[in-house]
């Protein structure tokens, strides 16, 4: 290749406040300096795509050079890195317009000229113009030599700038079609004068561009030593895995690709690969990992999908495409028509983004539904790793609340195990005749839940109760009022009514007992006063003298504990004391004529009930004093 300056050299100022913009971009716009290579290879890919598209109707543009690609070479002596392509190239006017203006791209102009159908087929990126200027992150000067397809060698153009507000442009001779970008590297950019560093960056950012990317490497002799002779070696695969038909990709390839995008050593549990054409054209490849990352609940945890636009890598951790409760999902989305902000690091919050988010969310939920139905063992592995995160779903995603609810798993009295294997659908299938509610209990632990006195009548009547003991559970139930038309009912709430499971004789007996016990209830109210909201009789207990419950719309015990643990203000919870009139201890108290001794029994009843419900009491000394006096009364 030979380039010689000829005529018509001029110095021009940039058409905007480029000096300030370059300074801002270099120090703020891009998060890491190696992105410059992604931008320049992306631009080269655009140029090749433009030529390929134009050559469909004008094949003579190839001029005998139809092997399209991008080539990278470096010169340690000159301290330069060169990115070359044999794409569409630029004329002098195009150079001035496209390289002399910030936020202007030849791609956007080219794209606007296409008909709707053509634009579907032309894979173009770069709807803005700052990508080229990212070269100044690592270079203190940039030379561009370019020759437009179909033009003569003598009509080539050279552009040169130090990024300080002005540039020079002149006409040169250039034998080959396309563009060479020569970066004169600053000190902190010299790390890119390395074949292995370039290989690493190309593999990271450009492995799945549909055109080959080559680097110039030394030819080795028989002893494995580098000679002065060089050759071009293709570095990228030049075919994106997700663009291939699903039938052409093996399970092993899917697993290896997962490890590539996630940096995980384990195989994924399951994946979903889909290409969608229509209002939005995109491909998604979504994976469910086998293990949760250690920082899944860390607020700083980065999550989201890899974003590609027309097979060019744009960013990691694009959280806009997945709700927070699905933050464990790995994979990518490749959009053909997604608009981006000028930095490509920040997605525009627009209708396309929202549409893709909804589609990806439904895809993941469907994938999980299939796993739950067809592979219960794997779904149980998934639940152990990500169940707590899934429980955030009903609060965050109202539109998919029923789907999320069907994926939740709990322990229950149906199985004597702390394993959360019970689905809400299976619970509903086992509901007793006449049962119209889904009964549940929240507690600090599985042991506390399964031994709760609130369960006594449910056990005697054979009614299944869901046992919840994760810290998030009571918060979750605020956002999950029903499932399949069946309302949820906490069995620790005052509104609990099991009368539909009693026969008439039982109801009549309870009514008589309640009437007889009224005076005892009044005595208890008089002694306990404002320490409880109310005192009432209950027939849901068998082996326990009393329990405390809260009103249906009052904060529950577990929610109060959750707020307290988070350092949040906790409103005072006023409990209702429910007393079992058929328990021997309560009968003994009812027969007690001495008010002081009666008061001690009242202390014991309330203290036991509070201890069972909360695991603590406000004044243990008062409770212990009453117990001691009852055990060893003074003579």
Curated annotation (Swiss-Prot):
Q: Which domain of life is it from?
A: Bacteria
> Which keywords does this Swiss-Prot/TrEMBL entry list?
ATP-binding, Chaperone, Cytoplasm, Nucleotide-binding, Stress response
SMART domains linked:
HATPase_c (SM00387)
Q: What induces it?
A: By increase in temperature.
PANTHER family, A to Z: HEAT SHOCK PROTEIN 90 FAMILY MEMBER
Q: Which GO terms describe its molecular function?
A: ATP binding; ATP hydrolysis activity; ATP-dependent protein folding chaperone; unfolded protein binding
Major place of localization?
Answer: cytoplasm
The protein's name in its UniProt record:
Chaperone protein HtpG
Tagged with keyword ATP-binding: yes
Query: How does this protein assemble?
Result: Homodimer.
One Pfam family here: HSP90
One GO BP annotation is: protein folding
Q: Where does the record place the region A?
A: 1-344
Membrane spanning stretches? none
A single GO cellular-component term from the record reads: cytosol
């Amino acid at each position: 290749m030979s380039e010689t300056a000829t005529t018509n050299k001029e110095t021009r100022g940039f058409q905007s406040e480029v000096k300030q913009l370059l300074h801002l971009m270099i120090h703020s716009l891009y998060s890491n300096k190696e992105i410059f290579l992604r931008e320049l290879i992306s631009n080269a890919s655009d140029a090749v795509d433009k030529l390929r598209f134009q050559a469909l109707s004008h094949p003579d543009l190839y001029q005998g050079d139809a092997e399209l690609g991008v080539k990278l070479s470096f010169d340690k002596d000159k301290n330069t890195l060169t990115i070359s392509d044999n794409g569409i190239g630029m004329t002098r006017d195009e150079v001035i317009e496209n390289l002399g203006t910030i936020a202007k791209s030849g791609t956007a102009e080219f794209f606007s000229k296409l008909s709707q159908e053509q634009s579907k087929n032309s894979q173009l990126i770069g709807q803005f113009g700052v990508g080229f200027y990212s070269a100044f992150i690592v270079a203190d000067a940039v030379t561009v030599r370019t020759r437009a397809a179909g033009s003569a060698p003598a009509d080539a153009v050279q552009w040169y700038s130090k990024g300080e507000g002005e540039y020079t442009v002149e006409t040169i001779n250039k034998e080959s079609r396309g563009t060479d970008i020569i970066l004169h590297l600053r000190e902190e950019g010299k790390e890119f004068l390395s074949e292995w560093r370039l290989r690493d960056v190309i593999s990271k950012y450009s492995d799945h561009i549909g055109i080959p990317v080559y680097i110039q490497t030394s030819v080795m002799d028989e002893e494995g030593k580098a000679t002065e002779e060089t050759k071009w070696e293709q570095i990228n695969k030049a075919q994106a895995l997700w663009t291939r038909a699903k039938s052409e990709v093996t399970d092993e390839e899917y697993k290896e690709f997962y490890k590539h995008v996630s940096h995980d050593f384990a195989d994924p549990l399951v994946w979903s690969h889909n290409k969608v054409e229509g209002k939005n054209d995109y491909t998604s490849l979504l994976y469910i990992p086998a293990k949760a990352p250690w920082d899944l609940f860390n607020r700083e945890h980065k999550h989201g999908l890899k974003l590609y636009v027309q097979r060019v890598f744009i960013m990691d951790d694009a959280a806009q495409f997945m709700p927070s409760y699905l933050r464990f999902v790995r994979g990518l989305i490749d959009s053909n028509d997604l608009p981006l902000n000028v930095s490509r690091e920040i997605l525009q919050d627009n209708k396309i983004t929202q549409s893709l988010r909804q589609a990806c969310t439904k895809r993941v939920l469907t994938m999980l539904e299939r796993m739950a139905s067809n592979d219960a063992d794997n779904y149980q592995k998934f639940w152990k790793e990500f169940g707590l995160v899934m429980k955030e779903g009903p609060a965050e995603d109202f539109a998919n609340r029923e789907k999320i609810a069907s994926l939740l798993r709990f322990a229950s009295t149906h199985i004597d195990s702390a394993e959360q294997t019970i689905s809400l659908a299976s619970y509903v299938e086992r509901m007793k005749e006449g049962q119209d509610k889904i009964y549940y209990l929240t507690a600090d632990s599985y042991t506390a839940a399964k031994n709760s006195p609130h369960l006594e009548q449910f056990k005697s009547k054979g009614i299944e109760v869901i046992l919840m003991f994760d810290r998030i559970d009571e918060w979750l139930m605020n956002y999950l009022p029903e499932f399949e038309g069946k309302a949820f009912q906490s069995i620790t709430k005052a509104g609990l009514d099991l009368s539909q499971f009693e026969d008439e004789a039982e109801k009549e007996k309870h009514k008589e007992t309640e009437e007889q016990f009224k005076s005892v209830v009044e005595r208890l109210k008089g002694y306990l006063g404002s320490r409880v909201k109310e005192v009432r009789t209950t027939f849901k207990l068998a082996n326990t003298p009393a329990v405390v419950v809260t009103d249906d719309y009052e904060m529950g015990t577990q929610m109060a504990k959750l707020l307290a643990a988070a350092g949040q203000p906790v409103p005072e919870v006023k409990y209702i004391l429910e007393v079992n009139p058929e328990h021997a201890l309560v009968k003994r108290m009812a027969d007690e004529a001495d008010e002081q001794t009666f008061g001690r029994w009242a202390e014991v009843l309330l203290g036991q009930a509070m201890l069972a419900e909360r695991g603590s009491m406000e004044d243990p000394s008062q409770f212990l004093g009453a117990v001691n006096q009852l055990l060893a009364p003074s003579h």
